[in-house]
Amino acid sequence: MESIDTYFPYSEYRPGQRHMLEVAAQVARAGGIAMIDAPTGSGKSSVVASLLAERNKRKIVIAVRTVSQLTTFIRELELVRKKRPDLKSVYLVGKGSMCPLGGEGDVYRRCEGVKKFSNALMRDRADKGALTPAKDPFIIQQIRLMDKEHPLLCPYYIASKMFVPAESMGVKMVPSTALRTKADRVIASPVPPRELAEFCAGICPYELMMQAARNTDIVILNYHHLFDREIREQLYANLGVEPQDVLLLIDEAHNCGDVITGIESVELEQRDLEQAARELTGMRKRHKGADAVHHVLPRLTEFMKGLENSQEAEDWFDPAIFNRMIIKESLYKNMDEIVDDLIGISEVIRENSQKNGQFRETAIERLTEFLFRLAQSATDTAFLTVYQKNETGITLEVRNIDPAASLSDVCGSHACCILISGTLSPVESFRRYYFGSAAVTTLALPNAFPKENRLVTCSNDITTAYSMRQNKENTTRITDYIRAFSLLKGNRAIYFPSYQILETYAGLAVPHLRNRKVFIEPRDAGEAGSALTQFLSLPSRGESGVMFAVSGGKWSEGLDYRGEMLNGAMVVGLPLAPFNRVRRMLIEYYRHKFGDEGEFICYTLPAINRSLQALGRVLRTPEDRGVLVLAEKRFLEKRVRGALPGWMQDEMIECDITKFRDVIGSWK
């Protein structure tokens, strides 16, 4: 065992940081799971020093959600390498951002398909003596002739491979000399993600980084590499490791639940059924079940059209009624028989699509996955059957509502797992949500930033609770808070529970902010990036503005607003999810699981976390100064206030509108 200090790259520890690293080291040494709530400025990325000290030649995997978090760890490990030049690390981002091959469809399917055809061609040519595929005139000609929109071969993958004599007879495929050389270079001198494509210069970036990853101490990867079981198992097989030999670190762990439930949920739209019918038309002679499945589709369409009469935008549908309606007058006895036929048909369609360079997910595949998950939901209460009604029609969904089983499986299968975040508050509630009654080490650190650099207030006279939304006095006071806050110098952000509430108060407040540049978060994600860039660039020109955004939206999480980019944030309202029958069923599930605390864990805790994430955009370095405002009296309720970080509870100034004006007026 080595000392933490051996891998700690800084001259001194921040308050609480040494203790955090010792806790992480103990868990890494003994095995198990730890959850660490470490506010911005705690130096939580240095937890990697604990894992390095305890690794005993085992591989370390760091899972991150965004490229900015990836960059944080790349930077941290570069500092560690100054003390330990022998340390080797590499990153693996998703193929979507690494793949240089053009074409339509899903990048993972495209990769699978072109690798299959490329391997077959390369092996055939190798048997005829062409051991360096990238230099084989025949392969070069085939690449030149193929349809670039529907590729069957990947020149980047082909350049990554070569053949050598096998030990017994024939030849075997190995990484090309160029690939191995570049992999060694990227280990010796890490290449930033934005420069990777240029560095690879004709070689597959993913193959290159995978080759490098096999020979490194640390691999940084994105959430989907870890939480998608199929991708994780394939990845670990390629790395030549078993989970029990890997030390796992999960960053921004407050996001784990949403990512896992998203991966394990599946949707079906009305247009999927229309496309499925077209796909089945050409299958009747190729699969005996095609006709029988085709006769089921009108029943599915009828079921979805029946839901169009609903007055609810989202509601539960009964899977038993769904099953009876689909099977009625069909050739099937139960849903399992339909799924079996669909699986067979899907395999034929997918194989045929790949041969034609078509790599989109087919509607039949989506229908198969939906009905398979729906059948599973009958015996698993962690799944709800839900429909949503919008402008495009009805969408059916089998929704996972509990990430605990999958997360426990992932974390428990590794030698150890450390989950860190700046917003795992209260950490005991997150522990129960993620791991139930399992033994988990928890730690919550204080805020390491100077107290004098921040002002925290909470309003006691306003709310966005549904019962008060039509109250004119309440609405006027909320508008007054927004106006008072917006008059402060510097860039300000105001977050609302929903777009509807945002638009209401933007309409009321913006006309009074004549001397301020105002930016309103667009619903369209494509427009959000450029508008945000304009807002953040104001201070560099000696200007400032006010940003109206949604809690949990595009402008509230995973963004680093350092220095003068953001001087204050206000959260208007407690951003609870809309209450409907689906939400009530979710609450009932968690009450059954956790008793009275269940509603808090599944309903209130996510709202608190969205609020903390929004406020957390302001103070990113010890030198940053800012005002943090909770403009909602429900934050003063005992259960909600008690869930806020300790430093926030201690420093919070309770205000009405008059006191609020005085308090922020004296802030300098």
Explain the meaning of each model-derived region.
Residues 1-7, 40, 58-217, 227, ...:
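A substrate-engagement module of RecA-like helicase motors
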Residues 461-473, 522-635:
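Conserved RecA-like P-loop NTPase helicase motor core
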Residues 497-522:
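Conserved helicase motor "Helicase C" RecA-like lobe of SF1/SF2 P-loop NTPases
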Residues 409, 463-497:
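Conserved interdomain hinge at the start of the Helicase C-terminal
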Residues 53, 57, 68-75, 190-195, ...:
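Signature of the SF2 helicase/ATPase Hel1-core->accessory helical subdomain module
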Residues 23-27, 45-58, 75-80:
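Walker A/P-loop NTP-binding motif
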Residues 193-214, 227-238, 340-463, 473-474, ...:
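A contiguous, basic/glycine-rich beta-loop/short-helix subdomain that forms a polymer-engagement track
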Residues 1-35, 50:
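Conserved pre-motif I regulatory segment
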